[in-house]
Each structure stands twice: as structure tokens, then as C-alpha cells.
């Protein structure tokens, strides 16, 4: 029924009957606006109303009359809070009532749809004392979305009439109870009221019985001032107004009526209603019957006031229709304030998608060999190689706690493992492992390489000369008689060189295997460094032109649009976002500094793979060159350590040997038998020495002498060779990684032909994908344009509602 047929109010600009079918266009427009807002992930706050009142004041009757359908909600019979959600649904010609699942009770684990006539009985079944609310959803095409909350009824007594027992008087609930007057049902009700009223977006509807004392004696007013001290979100409804007009002390004239209706003590919207009793509502079988009954009661009150000649300005405060229209307009204005925000968001998405479409078209135009070569050179020289050089020298950008490796973690990899000797037995440092620098710290790059060399040095120091067999000594001496130091030196030198080669060659192989692994794993760290640089750039330049960067974009809402937008987002490479000319070379979104060179790995996987392959080949090449340099230490001609001939230790060793002692004794005997032949002795001095040196040692003596001398030579050669190998690893492995890597890879990129560049960048596939994405984005742009036009039309219909008959 049209409101104008009941109340001729001029205070409300657009008087809406909440469920008036004459405003069908307005409700259709509202439905379209809400659907689009949901697709755009635009938050629109739903108005919420909390009805607070005592038993018997008509709170449940007010809610039922406001909803507009007879449901026989029991007055004061609810022990639980009641949440009634009114939801607009354009497909519901008749209201659909759904009770949400109630896990606090058995056998109510699922949602249930019931008839309007069964609402009261269903509430009675669930009516058990608990703070968990009964949730009801009513869908109807002539509703605006809102939430009606009815806590259990309160009973207020004078402040000195009751004292709360058994609870701490300092608790928030008791403090509230003391301030607002004692609640007879205890602190539990005080906490519940506080919980439901503390949200600022909720409107509080205080329901009370009309009395002769007027609003000055209102019990709810003091409660309202404590819950909402400004009363800027409070509404007062004084029910049973007809009983006051026709009671024992009725108004005698219009002045008394005006004084009562215009009481200034409240300062908040106030309404005086007469609602159908429970018996009257039970006789209503339809919406129209309930509406006619409410209108008759309202008209009766207005007729009495007319007889008293009351001021017409108070007419807007009398009757259920006035209250309903105030709530309707309040809700309508709430949604009306959200219309520009949704339009702004829609316009933002449209603009963003158009910018993306423009950038993709720029990509297609500038997809050529020149641009590709610029991208390749920029990425290789500024990003990839720069990160490698930082890791080889020193940097914290690689996040050592995440990407670094301890010595144990490094050895646990399949490409590395423990150290093994030439017999395949593991070489363990045991307690000497602590001699390895930073053995328990996470390292990468150059620092990890240096730790490897330190470990190699410790491992070589553990290596000792194995026991030499008599056969090996005999073969080393050959046909020469071991009668002097030079023969022994030759044999010991030869054995030491062969044994050191046998012992160190496996270690050198393992050294370069692990060194290659350390440098090859840097590419994974570089990928993470570049990714972190992208994330930091996103944070610095949050206002990107990319549609997909907005987490609340419609791509995540509407299934019809999600696939298109997500595909268009994937194609709009982050190169565009960072302004790298990633195929498009657009300067419109360029950023300063080195961030212009960031390339999205996902956009050009084969190019990135090719760069990594160039790096791997370079690492393998310098590893092979360095290893050849180290092998020069082993590939020597047969030589003797001539310094042994003049070495004091060797001379002492030969002097103390058994053969020399024997020769000396023979010489002394000759001297004693021929004492007078001094000249002969002097002349034969050299001959005696010759005989001494040519004395033939037995195999055991020879083995002992050669073994001891070879062991000493083994240690000297081992120390010298390990030191030289470490120096060559620095000079021919680590330093080229710092100095020559950029030139090598840059040269390889420069030598690539245009055809090879297009193949590496998959230019044909990229163009096909860009064309597909261009079509998708063009379609999305058209959809946004169409939606924007429709939204403007819907917002116009919603902002200026008129009955359909008037519009026609």
C-alpha cells in the first residue's frame, strides 16, 4: 500500500513503502547495484538495527509488523538472541524463510526452509537459553538488505531495588549494570546488551509502552544514554499509543497532545505506535491483511489527534507507517552513499584495463630483434652478472640464512659428498674439522669457495705416505747399486712423486667437482635475489598500472570475468610494470635506476635458461682450465731433488747409516796395519771414499733408508703441491669469475643472430599469446564500459525512486 494514502508527510524527500510493489524499478536497480558491487569486491556496509525493550512492550510485534508478514513471533518468549536478515532477491516473488544451521542444538546441523506460518513454532523448538543467536534469513524482491537483532527482553528496576550478587563489582558487565540501572536477569544480560550495542554501525531501537509521564519518565532513556550517550544512533518507539489516547487520563486538548508528542528531553527520532495484539495478528493470514490492520490502528490514533486539533508537524511521528518509512529512508540513504564508491571502483578497473590493453598493443608493435637484444643485454649485464659478481665477492642480498650452506649441508648434496682416497675409503677430519674456517656457518659464493680450499688443505695434511714394499723400493732403485746418497735420493724422489700423485689426484678431482657445484648453484640464488628485488619494487611503486595487482579486482570475483582478467594479467608481464621495455619498451611506465632491467622469468623462460647455460659452460670451461693448470704439478719429468746432496740431514743420515760405519771401520784397520805408509794413505783417501760410497746395502737397510727419506719428501711435496693448487684455484678459477664472466657471456649474447634471439624469446608464441590477450582485454574493456553505463542507469533509478505507474 502506498504510504501517501496513509500519511501525507513532507519531511521525507522520497517516501518509500518498504515492500511497496509500485517501486519495482527501484528494487531492481538496487539488486543490480549489489550484484555488481559483489563482483567488484566493493564493500557495502549492511545497516543493522538492535531492538531493545522490556517484556510486554510490543518489541516482537514491532519487528513482525515492520517485516510485513504475519509470523506470530512470540512476545517475550525468546530465551536466545534473534537475528533476522532481510535480503533482496529479485527471483523471490514470495518471501523465502531459511533457518540457518544451529550447532548448539542436536538435529539442526543444516539450513532449513520453512513456511511463514511455521516460523513461530520453529523458534519455539530452538528456544533454549544460550547466547548463540537464532539466525533467520528472509529473501524477498521488495527488501533492502538489513539485519534486525532482537536480544532477549530486559527487565529494569530502580537502582536501589536490587543488588547483583556473586560477581565482582569491578567487572565491565556489573559496571554497566550499575550505571544503566540494575538488570534483574543479572550480569549476563548486561554483557549481552553491551556486546550487541558497542558496534557504531548499529542503530539502537528502544521500545517502550506509552505512559502519561511522557518521554520524561522513560525507563529506556537512561539506558540509551549509557549505551549511546549522544543518542545519535538511537530511535525510540513508544507502543500502545491508543491505550494512552483512550485511557483513564486522556489528552483533553491539542496543547496537551502537542506537549507530549514534542517532548524535547529525548533529542532522537521518536515514534508513537499502536500495533496489533497477538490475537489480532493470529487472525491475519496474509501480508495485505496485516498491513490493513496496522493502517486501521494508525488511522484511529490520527483521528483522535485530529479531534484534539494537534499540530500536523507531529503527524510524521505517529504510526507504524512513519516508523517504517524512517527506517526505509535511513537504509536507502546508507546504500545511496555507497553508490559513488562503487562507480569509482568500476571506473578504476575500466581505466586500468584500458591501460593494459594499450600496453599490450605497444608490445605487439615493438616486438622486434632490436628490442629483444636490448632486453637480453640489459638483463645479462645489469641483473644476472651483477648478482653473480656480488655473490662471488661478498654480499648479504643472497640471504645467507636461507640460501647459505654449512659444511655439513654442502657435503649432504648429491653433487658433492665426503672426501675419499684413491682406495675409495672416506677421509675424516674428526676433531680437526674445526680447523676449517666457518665450518658451521651458512655461506655461499666466494666465501663458500674459500672454505672449500681451507678444507682441502686440512684434508691433504691428513694424507701420509703409505708403507712402501720392498719390491717398490727395489724397482725404484733399479740396476744401480745403493752405494751412495744420490742413488737413494733418486729412488726416494721417484717414489714420493708417484705416491703423491696417487694420493692427491682423487682429491683434486673432488675439489673441482665441489667447486663447480658451489658456483653453479649461484644461479638459483640469483633468481631469488631478482625476485626479492621485484617485491621490493612493488612495495616502492605500489600504484602499478597492472590490473592484476589489485587483489580485489573483479578477476577474483566473477567467474565470467576471472578467466579473462587473470589471463590478461599473466600476459601483462611484470616487465611492463617495471618499465623494462620487456618487448614493448614503453617509457610511459618506466622507473628510474637499475630496476628498469628486471625481467620476469616466467615471461621468457627459454631466454633465462639460455643465459644459465652460458654461465654453466663458462664455469665448466674455467674449471677445466684451472684443473689443467693444477695437473701441471703432477705432469713432470723424472727428477731428483739435488738439494738433498747438500742437505745436512741427508749427510748426517748417510754418515750414521750402517754402510758408512762399516767402511770407516775397514779404513781404520788398514791404517793400523800400515802405519808407516802415510803417503799411500793420503793418496788412497779418495779411493777409500769411493769404496765407501760403492758399498752395497742389503735390501732391508735400503728399504729403511728409502722409506724414511721418501716419507720426508712426500710431506714436503704434499705441502708444496697443496699450496700451489690453492693458489691456482684463486688465480685461474675465482678471479676469472669476478673479472671475465661479464665479457664472456656478453660476447655470447652479442654473437646471437636475430633469428636465434627470436627463437630464444619464442617470439612467435609470444605474439600469438599477446594477440589472444589483446582480444580478452578488449572484451573486458567493453564489458566494463557496458557495466559502467548500466550502473549509471541503475544508480539513477535507485537515487530517484518513483512508482512505476508515475514513471509510465
UniProtKB/Swiss-Prot annotation:
One of its GO terms (biological process) is actin filament organization. GO terms for cellular component: cleavage furrow; cytoplasm; membrane; microtubule. The keyword Iron-sulfur does not apply. Residues 53-60 are annotated as: G1 motif. One of its GO terms (molecular function) is GTP binding. InterPro entries: Dynamin_N, G_DYNAMIN_dom, P-loop_NTPase. Residues 239-242 are annotated as: G4 motif. Disruption phenotype: Produced cells are larger and a large amount of them contains more than 2 nuclei. Residues 536-565, 665-695 are annotated as: Disordered. Residues 552-565, 665-694 have a biased composition (Low complexity). It comes from the Eukaryota. It is found in: Cytoplasm. Its main location: cytoplasm. SUPFAM superfamilies: P-loop containing nucleoside triphosphate hydrolases. Residues 43-340 form the Dynamin-type G domain. Involved in cytokinesis. May hydrolyze GTP. This is Dynamin-like protein B. It comes from Dictyostelium discoideum.
